[in-house]
Amino acid sequence: MSQSISLNSQNRYEIKIYGQLDDSWLGWFGEDAKAHAEILADNSQVTRFSNVVMDQAGLVGLIRRLHGLGIVLISVRLGLFGRLNK
């Protein structure tokens, strides 16, 4: 049975930002989020946050907070498991 994604559904996301953020930022990304430091081909550093669980309003709020701090957003994608079964 396929599950639809809606504005109010809790979904799992992966968020990638330019630069390196340490684990002290994890609270912004949800209690189950994990941070992964990566190096791109041009030797620039990025941080990938996986297992970010929130609804669309939470996601938009997070993106606004990052933008307000001047943090460059590289990508946001729906995680492998998509919508959570609750």
Annotated model-derived regions:
Residues 1-86:
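Long, contiguous binding/interaction regions
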